[in-house]
């Protein structure tokens, strides 16, 4: 099964080698037929502490690093390639 890749915005980089990424999704409400936005925060591993608050980043599903951290930051050119592949 392929690993999921999500795009989101960094909302916190306070942790050591950890970032918090807000991922927003849109869907049509089944009854109201209106587009609804929902967001969720994911803790992701940032090995080099390179991501800063406000940046748009890609995160990839991976093995658990801790109780809440099961995503890792996709670095540089790999992120652009993944974005083109997902689109």
From Swiss-Prot:
Keywords: Ribonucleoprotein, Ribosomal protein, RNA-binding, rRNA-binding
Family: Belongs to the universal ribosomal protein uS17 family.
GO terms, biological process: translation
SUPFAM superfamilies, per database record: Nucleic acid-binding proteins
CDD domains per record: Ribosomal_uS17 (cd00364)
Protein name, as recorded: Small ribosomal subunit protein uS17
Subunit organization: Part of the 30S ribosomal subunit.
Gene: rpsQ
Function text: One of the primary rRNA binding proteins, it binds specifically to the 5'-end of 16S ribosomal RNA.
Gene Ontology CC: one annotated term: cytosolic small ribosomal subunit
GO molecular function: rRNA binding; structural constituent of ribosome
Lineage of origin: Bacteria, Pseudomonadati, Pseudomonadota, Alphaproteobacteria, Hyphomicrobiales
């Amino acid at each position: 099964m392929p690993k999921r890749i999500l795009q989101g915005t960094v909302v916190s980089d306070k942790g050591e080698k950890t970032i918090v990424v807000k991922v927003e999704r849109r869907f049509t409400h089944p009854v109201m037929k209106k587009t609804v936005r929902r967001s969720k925060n994911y803790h992701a591993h940032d090995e080099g502490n390179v991501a800063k608050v406000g940046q748009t980043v890609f995160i990839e599903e991976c093995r658990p690093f801790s109780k809440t951290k099961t995503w890792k930051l996709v670095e540089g050119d790999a992120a652009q390639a993944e974005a083109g592949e997902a689109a």
